[in-house]
């Protein structure tokens, strides 16, 4: 699943290419992907423009005059810019036609979703989504720690909970906890304020570094047609099972936490 750096990379790519260009037509080939009435969805897009594109956690927010188009890529979603004349592939489910190109939403697993909402309902739409991991303010820390300390779950699992902090997935949770020297098995109830500060500090450092390298491509992520990320070349622990830790030279381990593969250094992160 694309995480914060990958979605930010997609956002930046789209902003460079589609803003302020009239949408001439919209084709919806898999209606279940649209959380509105399809006719309404098309009507509010055709002959309109994307004025700006924002991101919150793993969500893309396309700004129109009166509405926002919210898009979540889920597991395999991606946006590609192609010629209008290009043949439609079997995994292209929503197509936006512009004058001299088309923007195609490609999703092999069909899990992605899109919805048009009114501008005044944006906050309500995100009411159950936590602060963006790359934009956590000091005023957010007390509430975040309160939610973490109420949990009996491992901190690795908590970091994947988008209602607490949004944007972090399996890859970056491993990297953040390694850099913060926190065991992924540590219970939320035992996380201190200082440890949360470390998590927030290294979240921003690692996520921004990943954005610089256009995200991480381990399986299928591309920010545009065939453009892969490069941050997989700089990962410290994720997918590094049985390799030497670059800090202490001990062997990196892999365990399952709530069904998710978790990579860590037992020495650096104090796992016995």
Task: Provide a role label for each language-model segment.
Residues 1-116:
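Surface-exposed binding/hinge segments that line
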